[in-house]
């Protein structure tokens, strides 16, 4: 979005952006000529508390690397270190750290957040939704990717980018490496790779694939014995809630 707006941002992210990878670069880092640096900060090692951003953005708080009370403490410090702090009002825990609800975003149409995504639809590998009467179409899948886009749009609007520019930019969005990445189709079976590793993310990845196929067979590769043991009950709860009778999940 910021590149489409002519801001030439620098980027440090986790996974590589497909468009940057196509340029022959590593994909998750790029130096731009503009004044903005976009960082995907990491709470897993606590290093996020060392950042003092102009704008801090929080999409969700879910049990992952630490217990919830530890995560709330870490993100509370991050909030205090941010000049402006924007949260997802549709996430129960994230909204508790709201600085100003009018700067926040939500996918709940009854929310009082300043930026609300409405009329979400997924047609195959494409999603669409509306924000303030502007229609957004993205070549991606899943409601969670609508929330990701909504978060980026909210921040962009805070620094002067209009919704039309945001919509135009997202029409050409090419995705991120191993984030709902379509690898191909064999004998009518779509193969999709996703790095989802905690209970909520795994459930979201499965739900995103369901409109594409009558049956989803998910293969889950845990990060290790410790994290799997730590999150076992949450995995069962979240994944069971989204599986249809015909769907399957396997662990390898």
Go through the PLM ranges and name each one.
Residues 4-7, 18-19, 23-26, 33-34, ...:
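Acidic, Mg2+-coordinating active-site environments of NTP-dependent enzymes
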Residues 10-12, 38, 104:
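Short beta-strand "acidic-cap" motif of Rossmann-like dinucleotide-binding folds
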Residues 12-13, 40, 59-60, 88, ...:
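Short beta-strand segments
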Residues 35-44, 191-197:
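Switch II (G3) loop of P-loop NTPases
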Residues 43-45, 63, 91, 196-198, ...:
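Short, glycine/acidic-enriched loop or turn micro-motifs at the edges of active sites
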Residues 176, 207-252:
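Active-site beta-alpha connecting loops in nucleotide-dependent enzymes
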Residues 178, 193-204:
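Glycine-rich phosphate/pyrophosphate-binding beta-alpha loops
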């Amino acid at each position: 979005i910021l590149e489409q707006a002519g801001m030439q941002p620098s980027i440090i992210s986790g996974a590589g952006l497909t468009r940057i990878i196509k340029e022959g670069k590593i994909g998750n880092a790029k130096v731009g000529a503009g004044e903005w640096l976009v960082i995907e900060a990491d709470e897993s090692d606590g290093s996020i508390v060392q950042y003092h951003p102009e704008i801090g953005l929080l999409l969700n708080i879910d049990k992952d690397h630490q217990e919830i009370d530890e995560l709330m403490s870490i993100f509370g410090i991050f909030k205090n270190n941010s000049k402006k702090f924007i949260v997802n009002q549709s996430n129960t825990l994230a909204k508790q750290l709201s600085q100003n609800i009018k700067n926040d975003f939500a996918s709940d149409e009854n929310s009082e957040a300043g930026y609300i995504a409405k009329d979400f639809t997924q047609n195959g590998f494409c999603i669409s939704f509306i924000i303030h009467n502007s229609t957004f179409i993205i070549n991606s899948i899943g409601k969670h990717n609508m929330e990701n886009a909504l978060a980026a749009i909210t921040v962009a609007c805070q620094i002067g980018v209009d919704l039309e520019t945001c919509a135009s930019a997202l029409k050409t969005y090419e995705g991120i490496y191993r984030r709902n990445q379509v690898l191909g189709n064999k004998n009518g079976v779509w193969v999709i790779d996703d790095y989802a590793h905690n209970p909520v993310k795994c459930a979201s990845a499965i739900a995103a694939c369901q409109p594409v196929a009558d049956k989803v067979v998910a293969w889950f590769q845990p990060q290790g014995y410790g994290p799997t043991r730590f999150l076992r009950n949450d995995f069962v709860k979240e994944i069971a809630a989204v599986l249809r009778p015909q769907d399957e999940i396997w662990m390898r």
